[in-house]
Swiss-Prot record:
Family listed: To avirulence C protein of the same strain.
Keywords: Secreted, Virulence
NCBIfam families to which the protein is assigned, alphabetical: XopAH (NF041403)
Name of this protein: Avirulence protein B
Length: 321
């Protein structure tokens, strides 16, 4: 793997469409490095390397999935380097195409992996396996604070709350909200009581949406402004005039915004990582896997933008830079 650069050349296009016209002044990037990651590392690209027994990163199925992602990232990186992908929206489309290729058309969740979130739907992730390791991080987070959460089945619960926010064009953008119950003994007893009173199925349905331990994701009404910002970041990131430090900062910012926004119903974490890595690949950089214990979208959501940018290199399983 390497941090490779080469002299750029100008790519001219005779087409007159908006996208093609924007390529007229595009200066080609080095494209994917000839020196690829070791196969072992290729098979960890995109893996959710949870710090506990939830990690499935070494299963044959996961290794095949990750190597497929790696190869498709390099293909997208080559396309970017030649001016073939002119917006983040197009790059997200390539990531979505790859993700759908790992599913069978007609599978129950196929459409969710292909669909954007809308403002009339809730996006909630209960912090159960494989997310159990997140609980302690929320409780110990320096920006988390104590609140009382009201629930019609659990009553008033003491919870730790971390609210992720962003700043865009001088405005505060609320992103993800993490909640973790601290009344663990009461909660355990209450769940056992409700399972008997309501039945396991009814309780499961309630917990799927209103689990006291959960992430309430970025409201979809903010997605248009975030997507515009991602397009701006992408245009900056495909410049041939960037220093390596500037490039890595833009890649990290792109990854942070895409992962934190969670634009699609399913698969946004993988697509965000795909996009970040494809931009790096276009510049001749082979980003290594994330270190064991670092799940990139969770790291993004538990961080502010500047914090994530500052620690991005340290999250990767290499001292390449």
């Amino acid at each position: 793997m390497g941090c490779v650069s080469s002299k750029s050349t100008t790519v001219l296009s005779p087409q007159t469409s908006f996208n093609e016209a924007s390529r007229t002044s595009f200066r080609a990037l080095p494209g994917p490095s000839q020196r690829q990651l070791e196969v072992y590392d290729q098979c960890l690209i995109g893996a959710a390397r949870w710090p506990d027994d939830s990690s499935k990163s070494n299963t044959p199925e996961n290794r095949a999935y990750c190597q497929s992602m790696y190869n498709s990232i390099r293909s997208a990186g080559d396309e970017i380097s030649r001016g073939g992908i002119t917006s983040f929206e197009e790059l997200w489309g390539r990531a979505t195409e790859w993700r759908l290729s790992k599913l069978q058309r007609g599978e129950p969740l196929y459409s969710a992996f292909a669909s954007e979130r809308t403002s009339d739907t809730d996006a909630v992730t209960p912090l159960v396996k494989p997310y159990k390791s997140v609980l302690a991080r929320v409780v110990d987070h320096e920006d988390a604070h104590d609140e009382i959460m009201q629930d019609n089945l659990f009553g008033d619960l003491n919870v730790k709350v971390y609210r992720q926010t962003a700043y865009l064009h001088g405005n505060v953008i609320p992103l993800n909200t993490f909640r973790v119950a601290t009344d663990t003994e009461y909660l355990r007893d209450r769940v056992a009581h409700l399972r008997t009173e309501l039945g396991a199925k009814a309780l499961k349905q309630h917990l799927q949406r209103y689990n006291p331990d959960r992430i309430d994701h970025t409201n979809a009404s903010y997605l248009p402004i975030i997507k515009d910002h991602l397009n701006d970041l992408y245009r900056q990131a495909i410049s041939s005039d960037l220093s390596q430090a500037e490039l890595i900062s833009l890649i990290a910012r792109t990854h942070w915004w895409a992962a934190s926004a969670m634009p699609d119903q399913r698969g946004s974490a993988a697509k965000a990582e795909f996009a970040a890595r494809a931009i790096a690949s276009a510049h001749g950089i082979e980003l290594p896997p994330f270190r064991n214990g670092n799940v990139s979208d969770i790291e993004a959501m538990l961080s502010g933008e500047e914090e994530f940018v500052e620690k991005y290199r340290s999250l990767l399983d290499s001292d390449c830079f």
